[in-house]
Each structure stands twice: as structure tokens, then as C-alpha cells.
Amino acid sequence: ENMCTAATYKTKDFYFGRTLDYEFSYNEEVTITPRNYQLNFRNKESITNHYAIIGMAYVSENYPLYYDAINEKGLGMAGLNFVGNAYYNEPQQDKDNIAQFEFIPWILSQCATTKEARRLIEKINLLNVPFSAQLPLAQLHWIISDSEESITVEAVRDGIKIYDNPVGVLTNNPPFDKQLFALNNYMNLSNKSPKNSFAQNLELQQYSRGMGAIGLPGDLSSQSRFVRVAFVKMNSVSGEDENESVSQFFHILNSVDQQRGCCQLDDGKYEITIYTSCCNATKGIYYYTTYDNHQITAVDMHKENLDGESLIRYPLIKGEHINYQN
């Protein structure tokens, strides 16, 4: 039941990224799927020519199992845990039958915009087929975003739901309509100093900065992370250039960073933020940090041969990089 947070951010370019919070790593890699890599599907014809994709994937049997990715057109998509609510079906005759692990490649290989993705999803049936015996079905829901709009996609027992996502963030449970509704409880929070509306005849004092957001959840539960990252993202201010935008994006997601020791699982292990990503979806650059490496590492898809046929893979740089000044 690992937890994660995804967010979008727009300055002059469009940014999309996520945290992966878990107790161990599968050796995921920054993986580029070039335009002529043959994408095979269990129940659909292969796609041999498509948009190039860059993202974080666990590669098994030369297939990119993407956790989050963008394509060369600037569309981003991430899968986040949705345990207990995700529901996948047997094949249906009049639908595009797509396995859950094929969903990100299916959309990002063919769609340039969220609108195009929405049209494909209206015809889709997500299958309860695992990738392999070693890699069981992941119970997920998804955020899909371009620079204009975001949607959340949830495959639940009564079908596939497509929600408009006006905040451009996603965590885990509960279902997305309930997540959005919970923001009503925090509409009084502000980035400004509060005025005394408690009682006019009491002389109440602002004894600290930041009191306008007292009540913003600080714990690591998925509902609380949703509220917190939404507040941080919606109030975010930064410069427009690349370094300032990327730096600010990592600050947004670091507001829900999981430190080892704060979230103990029943088996005694601890959930941590294994990696944090930030994609410049406009320029096709994938930036990331890991739990032990604060230095931002980048892979630029346009420095590769995007007309190739083979996956291009970069293992994560995980050790801390410290820049000595003397």
C-alpha cells in the first residue's frame, strides 16, 4: 500500500512529477522509449511508430513498466497506489482491452493532449492481467496532464471514472471526488497573516509568521498529503526560468517528503520517499533526486536518438553528492 504524491506546475514551461514512497526499490531507471521501439500489447496490435516517451520505469523482459512519464508532445502521466478501490476486468468485446501495466505506454505513445487521452480512455477496458508471476497487479489510479488541464482516472467496480482535476495534484485513497471535497474543510487557510475573527473583545496577537495556515495537515496520510501539496502548489510563486522553476517544483513535492522513521509499517520496515521527479514536459527533460542523493540529476530525451528502436536506460544515481567549497 505504498504512498505517493504527484503534482503539476506551470511557469513558462509545464512541469510534471511525483514522489515514490515505498519501503524498498525495484531498481527503477530513467527510461526512454524511442519512436520506433515496438510496443507490444497483450490484446491489441503492436504499435511500431509512436511518440517518444521518457520516464521512470522498471524494465522487465525489455518492456518498460513506467511509474510516471512524459512524451515528446508534453503530455504527462503517473500511476499512484489506490489499494482496495482499483478494479480491473476480464476482456470486453467492444473495448480497447489494455492491461493495467500497458496503460501509460498506450496513452503516451498515441496522445498529444489530455483531451486526446480522454477520448482513448472512454473506449478502454483495463484488464486484470499481471505482467508476470513475479510482478502482480498493482492497484493504481492515474493523473494525466498537459499544460492546459489535468484529469484523474480511476478504474473502480462500477467502471472507469474520469475526473477533471483542477488542482493538478494526486495522492492515493480515498477516491478522487472525496479528495477534492475534503478541500472544503480548509478554505479558511491562507498564506497571509490572520485577522482576529475569534472574538473582537479579546486582544489576540499574531505572535508568529505563518499563522494563516494553522490547521494545514502535517501528517503523512494520503488525504493529508493531498491537502498539503495542493495548498503549497496553489500558493507557489517562483521565477520563470528553468533552474528557478525546477527548484520550486522540488520544493513543492518536498512538502510531502517522507523521512525514514516517521512511517513504520507492520513488518517493522519504514516507508521513505525513494525518488522525487520533475519533468519539464515542454522540453522533454526528466529531473530526479533520490532519498540519499539531494543533487538533482537530469536526463534530456532530445540528447538521444529518438528515432531508435531500443530502450535507452539510465540507472539512478543514488549516493549523496556533496560539493565541498574548500
Q: What residue spans do the PLM features occupy?
A:
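A contiguous strand-loop segment
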Residues: 2-95, 123, 128, 315, ...
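Short, surface-exposed beta-strand-loop junctions and turns on beta-sheet-rich folds
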Residues: 22-24, 83-85, 158-161, 168, ...
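Short, flexible loop/turn elements at secondary-structure junctions
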Residues: 20, 81, 146-148, 157, ...
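Proteins synthesized as precursors that undergo proteolytic processing into mature forms
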Residues: 94-130, 242-250
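Aromatic/basic-lined ligand-recognition segments
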Residues: 150, 154-159, 165
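C-terminus-biased signal that marks the final domain/tail of proteins
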Residues: 2-15, 129-130, 137-138, 147-149, ...
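Aromatic- and glycine-enriched pocket-lining scaffold segments that form the walls
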Residues: 118-154
